[in-house]
C-alpha cells in the first residue's frame, strides 16, 4: 500500500498515542540524527525555523528537512565544521491507518469500518503551541545568508507554515562580558 500524502496527518485531535511498550509493530523513525556540525564552534548568529501553525510533522518530512538543510549548508559553506545544526522535535506520536482496499470485489475481503482502529504506519512530531522552534542553526557572519537560504528551502518540505528568526550571539556575549 503506498504512503498517504502528508495532508492526511497534518491536523490532530485527541491525546498523543505514544506508549510504545503497548503498541506492537511500530516502524522505526527515518530520522535518527538530530545534531550535525561542530557544536563547540565560535558562532556569531543563531538562525531558527519557527512554526506559525499547530499540527503534526511526519518522521519522513523531518528527515527530508534534515538532509536537505545539511546538504545545502555543507555545499555552500565548504565543510561540515563551519556550522552547527540541531533539530529540536522528536517524532513520538504513533500514526495509525485503517487500510482500505479499492478494487472490484474488495467488499468481500475487508471489514470496512468494523474493527477500524488501524495499524501503526509511522511516527510524527506534534507541534502543540504556536511559535515552537523546529531547527536551530549556529553560523558565523559570513555564512548567515547560506543558513537563511537553507532553512527557506527546507521549509517547503514541511506541512506547516514557518518563519525564520535570526538571533545575534555576539551582542549577548559582549553585554555579559562588560
UniProtKB/Swiss-Prot annotation:
Family in the record: Belongs to the universal ribosomal protein uL16 family.
The protein's name: Large ribosomal subunit protein uL16
GO biological process, one term: translation
Molecular-function GO terms, alphabetical: structural constituent of ribosome
Record keywords, A-Z: Ribonucleoprotein, Ribosomal protein
Methyltransferase keyword on record: no
GO cellular component, one term: cytosolic large ribosomal subunit
Ribosomal protein as UniProt keyword: yes
CDD domains referenced in this protein's UniProt entry, alphabetically: Ribosomal_L16_L10e
Signal peptide: none
Amino acid at each position: 500500500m503506498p504512503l498517504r500524502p502528508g495532508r492526511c496527518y497534518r491536523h490532530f485531535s485527541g491525546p498523543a498515542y505514544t506508549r510504545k511498550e503497548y503498541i506492537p509493530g511500530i516502524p522505526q523513525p527515518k530520522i535518527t540524527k538530530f545534531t550535525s556540525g561542530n557544536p563547540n564552534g565560535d558562532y556569531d548568529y543563531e538562525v531558527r525555523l519557527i512554526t506559525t501553525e499547530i499540527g503534526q510533522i511526519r518522521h519522513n518530512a523531518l528527515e527530508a528537512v534534515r538532509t536537505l538543510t545539511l546538504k545545502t549548508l555543507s555545499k555552500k559553506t565548504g565543510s561540515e565544521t563551519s556550522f552547527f545544526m540541531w533539530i529540536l522535535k522528536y517524532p513520538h506520536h504513533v500514526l495509525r491507518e485503517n487500510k482500505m482496499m479499492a478494487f472490484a470485489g474488495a467488499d468481500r475481503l475487508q471489514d470496512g469500518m468494523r474493527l477500524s482502529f488501524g495499524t501503526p504506519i509511522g511516527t510524527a512530531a506534534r507541534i502543540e503551541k504556536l511559535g515552537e522552534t523546529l531547527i536551530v542553526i549556529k553560523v558565523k557572519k559570513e555564512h548567515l545568508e547560506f543558513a537563511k537560504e537553507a532553512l527557506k528551502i527546507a521549509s517547503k518540505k514541511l506541512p506547516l507554515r514557518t518563519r525564520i528568526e535570526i538571533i545575534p550571539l555576539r551582542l549577548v556575549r559582549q553585554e555579559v562580558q562588560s
